[in-house]
């Protein structure tokens, strides 16, 4: 009976994978009542606001409070909006039995498996308190990704203003529910998901009465393959849910982040390191301070760069109109009473005469005065 039970579970998984796309297309999406702008600390996230930049310190502190403080200092210098770490209980993220998930890093000359690495880089109570206190003194928003419910309780004691849930927990509805019940905003990463999975997470979140949700489009591969980034999904999620959407970027450079800002991403999360050459699982795909500074500079100007969407003549263009835009000119000297023809008029710059779109209206009309060659033809001269 146990064998049959497990075989039935396998069959469900096979059918789920086989028909995932069909489920993705057919699943009814309930009209939501989530906020289309969300306040993170003292910043508002949404359309018509500057893109919010999160420096994801993650595990890049390498277990050192000193390095963590340096990451905070550099994030402040880069003018990032927030810095994020990761919080989890010992032996809680992955099974200790996993033998084939080694990272290409060494500790004291020994290869570590994933669980051992997480345990080594886990933030204890003292570590948490010191970096949270330090960041707040430096006037930068600090928060964390909880990977289990106990960590949510702990972060509540540290009075975080909002939460991030990682892509691996997008299917962890109990954790989503736990964060939702805090009443604080949630940033949810959506790597390894489709609309069906995202919809399940959102509906669970909404049951708590919390209306402050931000989605991050994400490609959960490390480093990310640019051909699989599918950045258009950012606007797909925006159009479906009418909430802020951004990008959790695992691409080695900032090019993908810049492109996502260009198509309207409201928030960018990028891994942050002091040195890409440090040993550790995420350093190589992280941004160093100089690169992060460039991203922040672009993001801060993104609102004015993207503009209103209205196609208008900008103030700086009027001078160019006067000096370069074309109008109708006399090709040769034209006598008073002479008819305008294609032989005696032409189109050239600068502006000052009749616009070329009216040329058919003036052909055959007579000049009301003499016009010298290479002078503009105006309505008063007809």
Question: Language-model segments: which ranges?
Answer:
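Catalytic cores and adjacent flexible loops of soluble metabolic enzymes
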Residues: 3-382
């Amino acid at each position: 009976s146990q064998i049959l039970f497990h075989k039935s579970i396998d069959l469900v998984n096979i059918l789920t994978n086989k028909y995932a796309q069909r489920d993705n297309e057919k699943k009814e999406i309930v009209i939501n009542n989530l906020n289309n702008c969300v306040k993170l600390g003292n910043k508002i996230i949404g359309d018509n606001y500057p893109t919010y930049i999160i420096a994801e310190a993650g595990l890049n502190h390498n277990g050192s409070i000193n390095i963590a403080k340096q990451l905070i200092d550099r994030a402040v210098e880069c003018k990032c909006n927030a810095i994020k770490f990761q919080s989890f209980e010992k032996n809680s993220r992955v099974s200790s039995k996993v033998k084939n998930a080694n990272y290409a890093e060494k500790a004291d000359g020994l290869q570590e498996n994933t669980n051992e690495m997480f345990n080594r880089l886990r933030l204890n109570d003292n570590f948490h308190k010191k970096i949270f206190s330090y960041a707040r003194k430096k006037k930068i928003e600090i928060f964390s990704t909880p990977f289990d419910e106990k960590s949510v309780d702990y972060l509540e004691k540290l009075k975080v203003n909002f939460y991030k849930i990682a892509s691996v927990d997008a299917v962890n509805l109990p954790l989503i529910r736990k964060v939702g019940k805090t009443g604080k905003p949630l940033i949810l990463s959506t790597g390894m998901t489709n609309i069906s999975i995202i919809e399940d997470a959102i509906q669970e979140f909404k049951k708590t009465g919390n209306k402050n949700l931000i989605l991050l489009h994400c490609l959960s591969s490390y480093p990310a393959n640019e051909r699989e980034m599918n950045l258009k999904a950012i606007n797909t999620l925006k159009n479906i849910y009418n909430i802020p959407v951004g990008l959790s970027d695992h691409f080695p450079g900032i090019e993908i982040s810049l492109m996502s800002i260009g198509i309207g991403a409201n928030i960018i999360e990028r891994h942050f390191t002091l040195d890409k050459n440090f040993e550790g699982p995420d350093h190589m795909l992280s941004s160093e301070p100089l690169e992060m500074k460039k991203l922040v500079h672009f993001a801060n100007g993104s609102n004015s760069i993207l503009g209103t969407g209205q196609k208008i003549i900008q103030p700086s263009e009027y001078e160019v109109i006067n000096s370069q835009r074309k109008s109708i000119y006399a090709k040769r000297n034209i006598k008073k009473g002479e008819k305008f023809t294609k032989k005696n008029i032409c189109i050239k710059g600068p502006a000052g005469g009749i616009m070329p779109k009216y040329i058919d209206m003036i052909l055959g009309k007579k000049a009301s005065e003499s016009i010298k060659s290479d002078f503009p033809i105006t309505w008063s001269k007809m």
